[in-house]
Design a protein with these regions (language model features):
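Major-groove DNA-recognition helix of helix-turn-helix-type DNA-binding domains
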Residues: 18-47, 70-81
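A short, Lys/Arg-enriched interface patch at domain edges and termini
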Residues: 54-84
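Polyanion-binding surface elements
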Residues: 1-28, 52-63
Length: 84
């Protein structure tokens, strides 16, 4: 039997806790293309795809340069789609 798993969505406080960043640092990194942007969950709610965040954090740990991080984030955001 095949069980379909869905990406886990985490809210901003969880991202801040995981990264240790301030809100302004998080949004500056998103603006600079160094961290994946949030997704809309509703009219007034947004969240972050946990797997995307983890991929970028792992790349930071691995010592990716700023340019490599930008490329990774661009690929992550570009590849967002509904997979059936």
């Amino acid at each position: 039997m095949y069980i379909k798993t869905f990406p886990k969505i985490i809210r901003r406080p969880a991202v801040l806790e995981i990264t240790g960043w301030s809100k302004s640092t998080l949004y500056n990194r998103i603006h600079d293309g160094l961290f994946p942007s949030s997704i809309n969950l509703g009219a007034r709610a947004v969240g972050f795809v946990e797997g995307e965040c983890n991929n970028v954090i792992q790349a930071m740990i691995a010592g990716y340069s700023e340019q490599q991080l930008k490329s990774l984030v661009k690929d992550i955001v570009t590849n967002r789609s509904v997979k059936g």
